[in-house]
């Protein structure tokens, strides 16, 4: 698997997120020790949001409540905006929305999964009308992977468009089909 290329850190645009209206937000639960400066928590990551754990963790086999990290980016300076600058490490308190069917996100936080390189991935994006692609959680990694295999169980989404995030970097838009 290969991480989608970014200029710095991942970003997230919430196109439709029911958790904002429904109050299904985790914001007073710290990140686990899994998140370090070398492997930080970024916007758009899927995490284990079960508060019974007393901390936000990377997904594992059997995760029952997936959340998506959507911590608000800050302005980092007069000409440097926070969209691709933001990350969190262990002990920080990110905002995490509980995924629900019908949510729609645009993000560059994903793994190219089934595709060997960016060229193969972009070719697959051109065929979305005829060959659907899906995003699925990966145990031990917050970046969901893109796959051509439709999941038969668990949380997953379907890629609907290859586009950009507001700072102009390439991204995918996907809708959650099962949460």
Where are these regions (language model features)?
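Surface-exposed, low-hydrophobicity beta-strand/loop segments enriched in small/polar/acidic residues
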Residues: 1-179
């Amino acid at each position: 698997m290969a991480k989608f290329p970014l200029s710095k850190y991942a970003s997230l645009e919430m196109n439709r997120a029911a958790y904002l209206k429904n109050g299904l937000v985790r914001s007073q639960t710290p990140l686990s020790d899994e998140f370090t400066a070398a492997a930080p928590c970024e916007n758009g990551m899927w995490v284990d949001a079960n508060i019974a754990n007393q901390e936000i963790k990377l997904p594992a086999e059997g995760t029952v409540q997936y959340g998506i990290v959507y911590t608000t980016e800050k302005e980092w300076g007069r000409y440097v905006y926070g969209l691709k600058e933001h990350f969190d490490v262990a002990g920080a308190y990110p905002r995490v929305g509980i995924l629900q069917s019908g949510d729609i996100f645009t993000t560059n936080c994903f793994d190219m999964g089934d595709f060997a390189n960016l060229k193969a991935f972009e070719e697959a994006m051109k065929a979305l009308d005829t060959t659907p692609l899906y995003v699925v959680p990966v145990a031990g990694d917050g970046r969901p992977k893109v796959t051509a295999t439709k999941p038969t169980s668990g949380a997953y989404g379907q890629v609907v468009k290859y586009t950009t995030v507001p700072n102009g970097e390439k991204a995918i838009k996907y809708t959650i089909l099962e949460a």
